[in-house]
């Protein structure tokens, strides 16, 4: 049985295309698997990023709340320092303190009378 050069060439060409198609099919399957894995990883990373964003917002809110609390404490400390300086005045001038209290009470009483008119 004699095979012509054309037939042999055609047969080699068919075998080459068949082999190439098998190789390409395996590559496509591996790429599909890779795409699936990458998509899964991307979704997991997106979820983790969203969780981090939620945690950051919570920490930021707590940080702002702490700043406000610290500012309030500092204001109160400053007031206490000023009041502590007045302790000597109160001890040495009780009449002045009594006069200030009476003035404040009189002003309060006048305000009440004005409101009741």
Swiss-Prot record:
Q: Does the keyword Repeat apply?
A: no
The subcellular location is: Host cell inner membrane
Q: How does it sit in the membrane?
A: Single-pass type II membrane protein
Q: Out of the domains of life, which is the source?
A: Viruses
Q: Which residues lie on this side of the membrane: Periplasmic?
A: 24-117
Q: Which GO terms describe its biological process?
A: viral release from host cell by cytolysis
Keywords associated with the record? Coiled coil, Cytolysis, Host cell inner membrane, Host cell lysis by virus, Host cell membrane, Host membrane, Membrane, Signal-anchor, Transmembrane, Transmembrane helix, Viral release from host cell
The chain's Cytoplasmic topological domains, given as residue ranges, are: 1-2
State any GO CC term.
Answer: host cell plasma membrane
Function comment: Component of the spanin complex that disrupts the host outer membrane and participates in cell lysis during virus exit. The spanin complex conducts the final step in host lysis by disrupting the outer membrane after holin and endolysin action have permeabilized the inner membrane and degraded the host peptidoglycans. Host outer membrane disruption is possibly due to local fusion between the inner and outer membrane performed by the spanin complex.
This chain's protein is named Spanin, inner membrane subunit
């Amino acid at each position: 049985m004699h095979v012509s050069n054309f037939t042999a060439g055609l047969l080699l060409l068919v075998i080459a295309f068949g082999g190439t198609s098998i190789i390409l099919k395996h590559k496509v399957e591996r790429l599909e698997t890779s795409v699936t894995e990458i998509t899964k990883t991307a979704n997991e990373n997106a979820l983790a990023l969203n969780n981090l964003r939620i945690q950051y917002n919570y920490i930021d809110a707590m940080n702002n709340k702490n700043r406000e609390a610290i500012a309030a404490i500092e204001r109160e400390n400053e007031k206490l320092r000023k009041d502590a300086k007045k302790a000597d005045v109160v001890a040495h001038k009780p009449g002045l303190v009594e006069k200030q209290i009476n003035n404040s009470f009189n002003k309060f009483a006048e305000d009440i009378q004005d409101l009741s008119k």
